Amino acid sequence: MRPILLSGHERALTQVKFNPDGDLIFSVAKDQHICVWFAHNGERLGTYHGHQGAIWTVDCDPTSTIIATGSADNTIKLWEIKTGRCLHTWEFPTAVKRVEFSPDGTRLLGVTEKRMGHLGTIVVLDVKLDVDAEQNPERAMTIVCDESKATVAGWSYLAKYIIAGHEDGSVSQYDAKNGDQLHSVQIHDMGSEIRDLQWSQDRTYFITASKDKTAKLVTARDLEVLKTYPADTPLNSAVITPKKDYVILGGGQAAMDVTTTSARQGKFEARFYHKIFEDEIGRVRGHFGPLNYVAAEPNGKGYASGGEDGYVRVHQFDKGYFDFMYEVERERKNKMEQAQQ
């Protein structure tokens, strides 16, 4: 599995995203640049300029028309993908750590930082997918996190709930229509920040990655923990792969905690676990520094990882990845094939 190395950033990567078709990759980093790449060959399509601080987050709308970015310059910006034109800027009192479009692309949520006397919030903005339309500058809804600040958030199936992961290791569920908190569950160790939250393809369950060295698979409806994937290093990111029942975890010791320079020592690898059986089935090495984000290609053919080393690595899976099966999976497949005959 030879990776394509994308080198377009001078500082650590913060997020890497595929568009819904899987043919474009968007990458953002602490160097104020947003890059867009062709996924199949790693060629750079272009960059988007306008932010004045580290960019923490990016998301692409379902039609691949616009992207949203959130930055340490306290703004969320909308961009036209094709031309690189900035369509709108929303300003906030603190940095924006996460943005995500609703499944239909008409709403955008943003997670703002708790700082300088301001509480952390989750804001919801109405978005028009027409690039020439006037965007609404007002916020549709604001959820204030007065207990523990939200670090990540996303939309569940049909945009019914907003699910947020918090700094204290808890996950909470909000009604997406009025912002009422419906549910809150402490799923990770107390005080272990949730660093990432990524959805299954149908958005009925999600995976979290935490500083407590575990990733957990959780249902969106009642926040029940279905599976736990233990690692030996703090995790920054986790993703559920389409097509095959795997999850990919990324992490590594924080740069300031590393005392040895060996990449093996810092545990800077992408780890593959079986989604159902919770076993680790393989690792992919390559980054020289912690993995800050892992993203799965929507068609299940590969994945991309963004590291503290400033590189994005894009992997296309080999035949062995698709052929690999547990004994029980193979037996089930054979039984189903016999039944069809």
UniProtKB/Swiss-Prot annotation:
Disulfide bonds: none annotated. PROSITE patterns: WD_REPEATS_1, WD_REPEATS_2, WD_REPEATS_REGION. GO terms for biological process: formation of cytoplasmic translation initiation complex. One of its GO terms (cellular component) is eukaryotic translation initiation factor 3 complex, eIF3m. It is found in: Cytoplasm. InterPro entries: eIF3i, WD40/YVTN_repeat-like_dom_sf, WD40_repeat_CS, WD40_repeat_dom_sf, WD40_rpt. Keywords: Cytoplasm, Initiation factor, Protein biosynthesis, Repeat, WD repeat. One of its GO terms (molecular function) is translation initiation factor activity. WD repeats lie at residues 8-49, 50-91, 145-184, 189-228, 286-325. Belongs to the eIF-3 subunit I family. Component of the eukaryotic translation initiation factor 3 (eIF-3) complex, which is involved in protein synthesis of a specialized repertoire of mRNAs and, together with other initiation factors, stimulates binding of mRNA and methionyl-tRNAi to the 40S ribosome. The eIF-3 complex specifically targets and initiates translation of a subset of mRNAs involved in cell proliferation. Component of the eukaryotic translation initiation factor 3 (eIF-3) complex. This is Eukaryotic translation initiation factor 3 subunit I. It comes from Pyricularia oryzae (strain 70-15 / ATCC MYA-4617 / FGSC 8958) (Rice blast fungus).
